[in-house]
Amino acid sequence: IVGGTEVTPGEIPYQLSFQD
C-alpha cells in the first residue's frame, strides 16, 4: 500500500507513516 489511507495492524495509517 503506497500513498494510501490504509491502516496497518497496530500501526498508524500509512498515509502518515509513508507519505508519497
Swiss-Prot record:
Catalyzed chemical reaction(s): Hydrolysis of proteins, with broad specificity for peptide bonds. Native collagen is cleaved about 75% of the length of the molecule from the N-terminus. Low activity on small molecule substrates of both trypsin and chymotrypsin
Membrane spanning residue stretches: none
Keywords linked to the UniProt accession: Collagen degradation, Hydrolase, Protease, Serine protease
Region of interest (Disordered), residue spans: 1-20
EC identifiers of the protein: 3.4.21.32
Limits of the Peptidase S1 domain: 1-20
Highest taxon of source: Eukaryota
Enzyme class: hydrolase
Molecular function terms from GO: serine-type peptidase activity
GO biological process, one term: collagen catabolic process
Function according to Swiss-Prot or TrEMBL: This enzyme is a serine protease capable of degrading the native triple helix of collagen.
Similarity annotation: Belongs to the peptidase S1 family.
Protein name in UniProt: Collagenolytic protease 36 kDa B
Organism of origin: Paralithodes camtschaticus
